[in-house]
Each structure stands twice: as structure tokens, then as C-alpha cells.
Amino acid sequence: MIKAFAHIETELGKVFAQHFTAINSDVESEKVNNLWQDIAIRYNEAQRAYHSLQHIEQLFAQFKQIKHVLNEPHLIALALFYHDVIYAPTRADNELKSAEYAVEALRPYFSAAQCQYIYALIMMTANHKLAECSSAQKNFDSAYLLDMDLSILGASWSEYEQ
């Protein structure tokens, strides 16, 4: 089982690096890897049942199928990685804390507009409602992100129970 988790972590780390460097290829790979390691550590915290790396892996299985229709696939991917990075089961502000955390982590590498969009995407996962975005293209991408996040509710019972 631990070997399977290590494989998930390694593969997702590669995916994270691909999307990150597609936006900013000037960042040293060590810095990108450090960002990923921090994400992986957080998704492996003991209090997580559903909001784990397995959830992120499931999201990216779907993402692969639809990324070609997205206007900003790399920003959507980063929002997926960060959307549950902060998780305390008894708190109601996990999405806010995750959005703030993402912006803090990404601000040195991305534009203010890119960080704000990732923040807005993560905040939409709090109530799974589309917020007013500055363009129809961003609303389109946002809808896909929310659909992916809620897709477990339409999965088979055996998949849902995992």
C-alpha cells in the first residue's frame, strides 16, 4: 500500500511540475519540487480521509480527459492541486485557508492576475457555485473544475466508498 502511495506521489509531482513550468519555466526545478513536496506532505496528513492524494489523482484522471477544451488548463491544474491543501475536519474555512495558502506559495512565481484566478477557483469549491468571472472562458473553465470536484457523488458506490 505504501508503495502505491509513493507511486501516486511521484506521478502527481511530475504533473505538478509540468503545469507549473508551463506557466513559468524560469523557476529552478528544486523550487518547484519544494512546492510539490509541501503539497504532498499536507495531503498525506493523518486527519484526511477523502481529501488526500488519492482525491487529487482521481481529479487528474478526469482532467486528462477534458484539458484540451480548457482555456487555462495549467491554472486549473494548479487550482486542483491547491484546492484542499489546508484541511481541518472541524473548520468551515478550509477553502479560504487553501486559497490564501496557494496565493502565498505561488505569488513569487506568477502574476497577480494568475494568483487571483487560482484564489477565485479555490473559493468556488467552498459552495460549488460559479462566481462572476471576468470572461466567459474563465466561467467555462470554472464549471469544469467544480464538476470534477463533485464527480465523486456520481461515481459507483464501490468507488465512492474508497
List PLM regions with ranges.
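Conserved N-terminal diphosphate/IPP-binding helix and adjacent helical/loop segment
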Residues: M1-I56
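Structural motif
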Residues: E30, H68-P73, S135-D141
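Short, well-structured alpha-helical segments
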Residues: V32-A40, L53, A77, C115-A126
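Alpha-helical phosphate/pyrophosphate-handling elements in metalloenzyme active cores
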Residues: E45-L75, Y101-Y109
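Short coil/turn segments at secondary-structure boundaries
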Residues: Q47-Y50, V85-D93
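His-Asp-centered metal-binding catalytic motifs of divalent-metal-dependent phosphohydrolases/nucleases
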Residues: L59, P73-P89, S98, I118-A126
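Post-HEXXH active-site segment of zinc metalloproteases
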Residues: D93-A102
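Histidine/acidic-rich helix-loop-helix segments that form or flank divalent-metal centers
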Residues: S111-Q162
